Amino acid sequence: MSLRPSERVEVRRNRYKVAVDAEEGRRRREDNMVEIRKSRREESLLKKRREGLQAQAPVPASAATGVDKKLESLPAMIGGVYSDDNNLQLEATTQFRKLLSIERSPPIEEVIQSGVVPRFVQFLTREDFPQLQFEAAWALTNIASGTSENTKVVIDHGAVPIFVKLLGSSSDDVREQAVWALGNVAGDSPKCRDLVLANGALLPLLAQLNEHTKLSMLRNATWTLSNFCRGKPQPSFEQTRPALPALARLIHSNDEEVLTDACWALSYLSDGTNDKIQAVIEAGVCPRLVELLLHPSPSVLIPALRTVGNIVTGDDAQTQCIIDHQALPCLLSLLTQNLKKSIKKEACWTISNITAGNKDQIQAVINAGIIGPLVNLLQTAEFDIKKEAAWAISNATSGGSHDQIKYLVSEGCIKPLCDLLICPDIRIVTVCLEGLENILKVGETDKTLAAGDVNVFSQMIDEAEGLEKIENLQSHDNNEIYEKAVKILEAYWMDEEDDTMGATTVAAPQGATFDFGQGGGAAQFK
């Protein structure tokens, strides 16, 4: 449904803020998912292959030759796996595990083709022989770390429910390897993730996360938990909600890996409707998330910021929770420090959702000293950051009071908003036009109150070369932008421009013309 320009400001605020089945809310989250994909190194890996203890050593040039030699002994290894002798079974399974653990290009396909996967799955059930269970689980973990087809082989042989059962094993090593395997399966795709969850993996996984858990298990279990929460379409929130209390504890860890994966899990769980956001808030995570906005490692800071940003897409009360925990000074530091582009972009996005709130929330942003640095980014930053800063300023003009909007102008927002009117992004042009229109309304009110004949802000826009740009937008291909430009010119410049423009007819799309002559300036459609 297309909206008249006059309707867009309020609809944009409501949709962008509440984000319930909202076009704008979805746009933000989709953009951010692209950002996640682009910065995969900042996020945990979808799958992890467990390498051997010697993996830290340099790989000799002859490594490939060694693999070929081992593949030559495959028939003997297969024989050992299928023998009835426990020692031969363990020795052969360990050889396969080592083969699958080499650092570069492990021969996963060749191992699958050798037909040993169903036997490894059988070995998972050998409670009498935990060492064999462990080696088989490790081998299957590494097979599942491969392609989706490789993972499917592990699933199709019935390994998932057995791995879930192994989360209750008396062997620490077996439990940890089962956690890792389930993380690899869940990380393959939303379909595989849902299969793992449907097999009841979440609660026994959460049981691994207690004060006695060793660090390697803590890291693996938190990573697997993040894979359980990740992906689009999202898992059922009722299935993943039980993870919230554990995540609320994990974000107090001192370990960077645990912190990173716990914050990513929270970012996935908070990405959605207000009921999800409320559940995340009620888990008590907000104070710690705000603290983590100042974490020295970007790998922790980015998912913490993403989660805070998701929370402020909620309603005003949910946004206030973040403000009350002193997030604004942290966001200010993210804008002003020499941090990477993606962090500044996310910080501006977060602020734009706060300025889409009520007047008190806009005032909190002003009081935090954020507007000046925001305007500076709007003027000087890369385009991706400018776009988010434009939303933040425009939202503030939409919901701000008369005095708040005058403050935005005093901080220099007019010139950079005018400069963006020639950018190629249609949505940003519209956002800037809306911001300028809201500023002009305040100037008009001031003009009336002072019984004067000059709208000071229209003069400032003219001096910033904004008037010329708005006039040029009358020939824009996008009808919505054309209509908005005409509306602004008609409301704020027509009287002043009558003499200079005379009866000039400005070309307009779709057969419309706009005449600034004596006829009063109605658009005529022919």
Curated annotation (Swiss-Prot):
Localization in the cell: Cytoplasm, Perinuclear region
Gene Ontology cellular-component terms listed: nucleus; perinuclear region of cytoplasm
GO biological process, one term: NLS-bearing protein import into nucleus
Keywords: Cytoplasm, Host-virus interaction, Protein transport, Repeat, Transport
ARM repeats mapped onto the chain: 105-145, 148-187, 190-230, 232-271, 274-313, 316-356, 359-398, 402-441
Residue span, IBB domain: 1-58
Any one GO molecular function term: nuclear import signal receptor activity
Tissues showing expression: Highly expressed in callus, followed by root and etiolated leaf. Low expression in green leaf.
Pfam family, one: Arm_3
Induction: In both etiolated and green leaves, down-regulated by light. In green leaf, increased by dark treatment.
Principal place of residence: cytoplasm
Protein function: Functions in nuclear protein import. Binds specifically and directly to substrates containing either a simple or bipartite NLS motif. Promotes docking of import substrates to the nuclear envelope.
Similarity field: Belongs to the importin alpha family.
Quaternary structure (record): Forms a complex with importin subunit beta-1. The whole complex, most stable and composed of importin alpha, importin beta and NLS substrate, is referred to as PTAC or pore targeting complex. Interacts with mungbean yellow mosaic virus capsid protein.
UniProt name for this protein: Importin subunit alpha-1a
Organism of derivation: Oryza sativa subsp. japonica (Rice)
